[in-house]
From Swiss-Prot:
Species of origin: Callithrix jacchus
A GO CC term attached to the entry: nucleus
GO molecular function: DNA-binding transcription factor activity, RNA polymerase II-specific; protein dimerization activity; RNA polymerase II transcription regulatory region sequence-specific DNA binding
The bHLH domain, residue ranges: 109-160
Subcellular location: Nucleus
Region (Disordered): 1-105
Transmembrane segments: none
Protein name (database record): Twist-related protein 1
Quaternary structure, from the entry: Efficient DNA binding requires dimerization with another bHLH protein. Homodimer or heterodimer with E proteins such as TCF3. ID1 binds preferentially to TCF3 but does not interact efficiently with TWIST1 so ID1 levels control the amount of TCF3 available to dimerize with TWIST and thus determine the type of dimer formed.
Alphabetical keyword list: Activator, Biological rhythms, Developmental protein, Differentiation, DNA-binding, Myogenesis, Nucleus, Repressor, Transcription, Transcription regulation
Bias kind Gly residues: ranges: 46-65, 80-100
Length: 203
């Protein structure tokens, strides 16, 4: 019986069944391989998409690198502009340096003119006081300052007003200016020595 079974030929139906069972097993590894290939291809495509972007980024970064030719040209241009600014600054310094001596000269001229005007005023004031001292009767011992001279002139005017109000001078003495001036000077000196001057000066 065993020999009959083993020697019995395999039927075509059984062969087809066995083949059909083996085919799914073969297809599964192939499908796994295809899936792996698809995944790899998708990863490659993603990597390739990132690749151009990276290349583009690298291109942009390369443009910003200091060693690139474009950056070198820009650096040269900026250096040229900086040099021009320096020269312009130097020109401004030279112009300002040229303007400072002129202003100093103007200040010196103004100071000289102010000093000249001050001396002229002092000289004219001294001349006016000298003329006033000639008119006002003074004593030989008088050493009057300018303020004292002005006070004495005011007192002398007051004295003259009092004399004109009185009837002491007659027509003859009034007709002679020299005699009148001498009498007035003498009277004014007496008036000063009597103490009227000191009393009036104290007010």
């Amino acid at each position: 019986m065993m020999q009959d079974v083993s020697s019995s030929p395999v039927s075509p139906a059984d062969d087809s069944l066995s083949n059909s069972e083996e085919e799914p097993d073969r297809q599964q590894p192939q499908s796994g391989k295809r899936g792996g290939r698809k995944r790899r291809s998708s990863r490659r495509s993603a990597g390739g998409g990132a690749g151009p972007g990276g290349a583009a980024g690298g291109g942009v970064g390369g443009g910003d690198e200091p060693g690139s030719p474009a950056q070198g040209k820009r650096g040269k241009k900026s250096a040229g502009c900086g040099g021009g600014g320096g020269s312009a600054g130097g020109g401004g310094g030279s112009s300002s340096g040229g303007g400072s001596p002129q202003s100093y000269e103007e200040l010196q001229t103004q100071r000289v003119m102010a000093n000249v005007r001050g001396r002229q005023r002092t000289q004219s004031l001294n001349e006016a006081f000298a003329a006033l001292r000639k008119i006002i009767p003074t004593l030989p011992s008088d050493k009057l300052s300018k303020i004292q001279t002005l006070k004495l002139a005011a007192r002398y005017i007051d004295f003259l007003y009092q004399v004109l109000q009185s009837d002491e001078l007659d027509s003859k003495m009034a007709s002679c200016s020299y005699v009148a001036h001498e009498r007035l000077s003498y009277a004014f000196s007496v008036w000063r020595m009597e103490g009227a001057w000191s009393m009036s000066a104290s007010h």
